[in-house]
Structures are given as C-alpha cells and as structure tokens.
Amino acid sequence: MVLLTSNECNFDLEATDFNLPGVDGRNWSLQQCMGRNGLLIMFICNHCPYVKSVQERIVRDALELNQLGIESVAILSNDTTNYPEDSFFNMRLLAEKLKFSFPYLLDESQAVAKNYDAVCTPDFFGYNKDYKLQYRGRLDASRQETAPEDSKRDLFEAMKLIGETNHGPQYQVPSIGCSIKWK
C-alpha cells in the first residue's frame, strides 16, 4: 500500500466535465451532479483502509450537505482488474449496504482522475455553485482508524462555508490515503 496525501487546493480551478456510469444504472455528468450551492466530488474505492475508516461519515456528511443544497458524487478510478474488491459489482454492493444517497461512478479509463489530478483515496474536491474549486482537504482527522466522534469535521465545515459564501477556507489539511491504483 502506497500512502499519499492530496495536493493543495488550486483555488478557482474549474471542474472538468465527465460522463460516467453509476451503480444505479444511469450515466452521470458534472452538471447532473451539481447542487444549487455546490458539489463535493470524492475519489474513493472499496478496499482502501483509509476510505473504510470514513465510509459512514461520508454517508452522514453527504446527507447533511444535501440539506444545504450541496450535492455529492463518489468516483472510483482504481484498476478493477488487479483490485477485484473495487469491481463495479462490488461498488453496487457497497453503495446498497451503506445506503449511499449520492451517485457512485466508475472511471474505468481513469481519465477523470487524471483530469482532476486525483492522487489518493479518499481525495475530496469541493466546488462552489460556479464550478470553481474551493476545497481539497481531508474529511476529518481519521487515518486508518476512525477519528473520535467529537473530532473537527473539516470537510463538512468547509463545504458549509462554500455553500454560504461561495469561498472555501484558506487553511486546509490535505487528505491522506492509498494511492489510486493506476493501470
């Protein structure tokens, strides 16, 4: 397992469009995912312990952000041939098990991850309603183990600020996780 941190936030970088299949049987574009106050794009996978430690918090935060007009989407860009736990079938099972309220998309060509410069799982990208990047940080202090329940909710607080002001926080702690499994 190669451990990486996400890159710094390149404020105001415009989101790149995509058209990816979801576990719900639909294809999703950037515009279809955008909420009235913003969008959270999450590069995740099924097998990484850093993702597993925050899965339930991702689900919680996505539900709460939805109430603020901020939609969420998860994208899996790993090589599913060499990492069968990340297969489309297993993506669907995980989404059903955890009751994902957001689309879970497969980036089989890995082009979307490359366009976004995603490097690890989880890697979070918070956009304002104008499709401008405002957050590229961690969910919270969790690593391979889930952080205490009363830990600061970095991602949620940043996305709430983006929804209210159209701007993200200047100070951001990078996300940390397994490298994306490139083909």
What is the role of each PLM region?
Residues 175-183:
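Amphipathic alpha-helical surface "interface" segments used
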